[in-house]
Amino acid sequence: MNGKRRQAGLVLGLVLLFAIHASCSAALAQEPTDWVTKFPREPVRVSAWPGGKKVALSFALFVEVFGFGQGPVLRPDLMSRNPDLVNEAFRQYAIGAGNPRVARLFKELDVPLSIVLNARFPATYPAVWKEFRALQPAAPIVAHGMNNSNDILPLGRGLAEQRDYIHRTLDLIASTTGVRPTGWSSPSVYSNGDTMQAMAAAGITYNLDQMDSDTISRLKTPDGTLVLLPYPTVTVDMGQFLARMKSANEIETLWLDYVLELASEARADPAREATTVVIGLHPFVVGTPDGAAAMRRVLSRFKKEEAVWLADTEAILKAARAN
């Protein structure tokens, strides 16, 4: 009797073990889920970029409009003034002098630049936009909402409103620039699952809201698939400049360390996947003479780095699809 019980217990144990194994295997077989949107997200495997490069590096300049009295602040202690001439001058200088200066620098050094554009910018600053676009006529345009202050994504108001907002943004950019963007960057990197689904439905194919990886991934929304290009939090110049009080020279060091370390890792392990970095630039930081000088040194150094491929966002997307 005891022998039969032991045999039955052994059989039951094996059945339970098999069930647990099967359950674990099924769980592992499921696609990973994006931690924000809860949509399936999978890596895009890239062994190497064109020319055998291992680090794809793109610089994206944020060409934004805020409205008088709104936007980034250099001197919070002076905000109570009316008019706040110091902080408004900080913004207007960046818009009128900073944007063209960055465009000229990238043209001079023959480095690809991507434009992350608020839809209202060309009509609000037509002369600045004309000068800027003449310097960078072929740079891809990434949609960046209507403006960067009081007309941003309507989060929390449902999918339909986000769809309408994205369509209006794309329509306005198309009407003022002649280009209908296929890339998107949410104003202030503030988006959710509805945003991703709405942009896929609108024909957007890639976005710059991914801040948690060194490699490209693919997000599967109910209305289509989006390619997520890595846009690291720590490499955004504006955050380092205003929130962490870093100078242009300090940001220069950060960028060099960040990208060259990825290149060093690739040399140490040639079999590792190729990586991608999209660095966000703002004219408040790199559009001043000292900021442009730091930017010049950064670009000159990266042009000499054999492992780094300098490309715009659309070139990276095309190369990733070819892998």
Tell where the protein language model's regions lie, with residue ranges.
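N-terminal secretory signal peptides that target proteins for export/translocation
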Residues: 1-7
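Surface-exposed cleft-lining segments at the edges of enzyme active sites
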Residues: 89, 180-181, 240-249, 283-284
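A conserved mid-domain beta-alpha-beta active-site/ligand-binding segment of alpha/beta enzyme cores
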Residues: 230-261
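Active-site clefts of carbohydrate-active enzymes
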Residues: 235-236, 280-284
